[in-house]
Amino acid sequence: YQSDAKPAGVIDFGAQDDKTKAYSPQNDYYYIPEKNFVVPAGTEAGGAQFNHPLKDGKFDENPAKVTGNNVFSEKPSIDDWYETMKLNYGYDLQNGKNYLDPVPPVWTKMRDILVFWANKGVDGFRCDVAEFVPVEFWHWVIPEVRKINSNMVFIAEAYDPSKYANYVSYGGFNYMYDKVGLYDALKPLIKNEANATVATMRKVIQSQEGGLSNHMLRFLENHDEERLASKGFAQKPEFAKAAMVLT
């Protein structure tokens, strides 16, 4: 990673990493030492109709980095997040150890990025797959950003309901995605599937009692899911009016 727009004095991610080590508490990335990254078979950059001299199925990354979805191999599959890189928030994932004191270098780099945008007037952040980032980091960084704006809103995209309460109470998030919960309970009802039941919806609502419900961001559409009026969902938006009352 090499930024062409970073403020003076800012160090790029990975610029000071020891790439001979698979893991170091001081590294920003996780590495596959002495292995070159291999572009997954079937990759069709730009689509089949796109042609370019640089479209040769190769990408120079040596040593290969671990992917954002934790693939510790230089040969991720086409279904892996091979175009992303796992950031080191202080956890040695392969050996089950953590190094959180002193604060890992990635923590301060990410804080500086968030503060940069907060100082420009951004008043909220939607954090992609926030549960892949240790809750200890959020507990530390969210108050740091709120020094700029005490009303800063943090929304977590997360898919593990068992983590919701902790990411709100300890992590400091304002809202958690209610996808694996109310959305997944409502969709079968809207589609009138044979096994759809209000009992599933009731179970979700009861599991969010005790104040958690106020921190759930509910929806019937987002960029990852089917459009409401699509053939695979409600077919007609009118069929989802009742569900909209709950979301």
Predicted regions and their residues:
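The substrate-binding groove and active-site-proximal loops of carbohydrate-active enzymes
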Residues: E83-V106, D123-F132, A185-N192, D224-Q235
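Generic, ordered loop/turn and secondary-structure boundary motif
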Residues: N51, Y82, N88-G90, W117, ...
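Active-site-proximal helices and loops of the catalytic beta/alpha 8
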Residues: Q2-N27, Y31-K35, V39, D112-V115, ...
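Substrate-binding/active-site clefts of carbohydrate-active enzymes
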Residues: Y1-K109, I113-F116, Y164-A165
